[in-house]
């Protein structure tokens, strides 16, 4: 790979767009709408990652980028640059129904997959999860951010434990005057607030698993999204040591059930949330253990990014990247009408349609000084 200085950008039409439009022509809302409608139509079957429909989806995106006037920016095959980049992914699926239970002072409570809890297929490479009576501990937001003066773990040993955590950043629900207000930038979520970070940090801490407490406002989506996106096949990049990034158990729990769990431990969830907004917060053991038993089917599969590029005139080895993910949930649990297709107009048909329209406007302009890569990514 040649040495390249990557200048990152997003696929959203941000502050740079008015200046770009003024010099190269207007963005077409009609074209945006047409592409989004096509991508989110039933013909594309919800654009599931590595689903049988993938070749149709990525060909459509490549055709749109070609029509927009950019060049192929993908892998070289037989001496020719293509529109596609091969992406190996670890795919994992739970086999059968997971057996999950809480043991609270001798009382065993079975949890239902998708209804009470959303358990993800393991992405640590394991083909089986067997956890027996692992202790639960509430770790607030599960954040270790030394540059912000924040550490929810306080050096306590998390090995062998299931971490119960809140979604988003410690300042998301901060009230005016609280010391934490603005420490993580306010309402705009940082990476510390994302579930991906929380799983990764838990693995770094040596934890056995994670249970995220779902709340719609801090998560920014309802339980049905958690249910549909987390109880199907899961994907990750292929890692040399996936266990360093993923715990054995990764899951979400419904808030009412979490509140009961705290209550039976002599705690109030709302008060615990307030305590978690303090930099002096320390992990709180809960009076319950968790058991989990299920098989999994991990395998490495191949998916694809779609890449179009405009070479730069002055600095072709410096590349600005605009990106949006093309995949969505595919087929899942049927709705009241029996429809099983999760069409994904907003997530992320809008992003891909914006990406293609940006490519069109750039291509119609005088040509960029730096190369511009338009990347529709998988996974």
List where the protein language model places each region:
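Extracellular/luminal Protease-associated
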Residues: 112-242, 246-249, 316-321, 333, ...
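Catalytic-core environment of secreted peptidases
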Residues: 26-73, 101-107, 157, 161-189, ...
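Noncatalytic luminal/extracellular "stalk/propeptide" segments of secretory-pathway proteins
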Residues: 45-177, 284-287, 293-298, 302-303
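Extracellular/periplasmic catalytic domains that process cell-envelope and extracellular macromolecules
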Residues: 26-33, 91-95, 128-132, 155-159, ...
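N-terminal signal peptide c-region/cleavage motif recognized by signal peptidases
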Residues: 16-18
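Bacterial N-terminal signal peptides that target proteins for export
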Residues: 1-10
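Long, well-ordered, tryptophan-enriched scaffold segments
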Residues: 114, 204-221, 227-229, 235-305
């Amino acid at each position: 790979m040649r040495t390249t200085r990557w200048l990152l950008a997003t696929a959203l039409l941000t502050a740079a767009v008015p200046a770009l439009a003024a010099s190269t022509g207007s963005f077409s809302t009609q074209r945006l709408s047409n592409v989004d409608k096509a991508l989110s139509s039933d013909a594309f079957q919800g654009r599931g990652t590595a689903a049988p429909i993938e070749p149709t989806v990525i060909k459509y995106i490549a055709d749109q980028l070609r029509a927009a006037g950019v060049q192929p920016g993908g892998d070289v095959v037989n001496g020719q640059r293509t529109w596609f980049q091969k992406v190996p992914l670890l795919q994992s699926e739970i086999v059968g129904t997971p057996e999950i239970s809480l043991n609270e002072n001798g009382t065993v409570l079975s949890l239902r997959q998708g209804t009470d809890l959303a358990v993800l297929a393991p992405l640590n490479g394991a083909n089986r999860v067997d956890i027996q009576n692992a202790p639960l501990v509430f770790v607030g937001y599960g954040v270790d951010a030394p540059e912000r003066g924040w550490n929810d773990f306080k050096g306590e040993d998390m090995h062998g434990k299931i971490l119960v955590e809140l979604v988003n950043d410690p300042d998301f629900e901060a009230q005016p005057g609280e010391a934490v207000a603005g420490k993580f930038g306010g309402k705009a979520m940082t990476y510390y607030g994302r579930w991906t970070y929380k799983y990764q940090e838990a693995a770094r801490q040596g934890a056995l698993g994670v249970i995220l407490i779902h709340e719609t406002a801090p998560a920014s989506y309802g339980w049905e999204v958690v249910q549909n996106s987390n109880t199907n096949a899961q994907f990750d990049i292929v890692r040399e040591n996936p266990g360093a990034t993923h715990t054995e158990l990764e899951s979400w729990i419904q808030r009412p059930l979490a509140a009961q769990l705290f209550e039976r431990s002599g705690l109030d969830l709302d008060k615990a949330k307030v305590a978690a907004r303090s930099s002096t917060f320390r992990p709180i053991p809960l009076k319950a253990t968790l058991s989990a038993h299920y098989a999994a089917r991990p395998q490495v599969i191949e998916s694809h990014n779609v890449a179009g590029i405009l070479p730069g005139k002055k600095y072709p080895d410096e590349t600005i990247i605009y990106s949006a993910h093309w995949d969505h949930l595919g087929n899942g649990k049927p709705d009241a009408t029996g429809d099983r297709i999760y069409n994904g107009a907003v997530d992320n048909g809008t992003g891909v349609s914006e990406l293609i329209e940006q490519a069109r406007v750039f291509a119609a302009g005088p040509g960029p000084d730096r190369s511009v890569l338009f990347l529709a990514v998988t996974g």
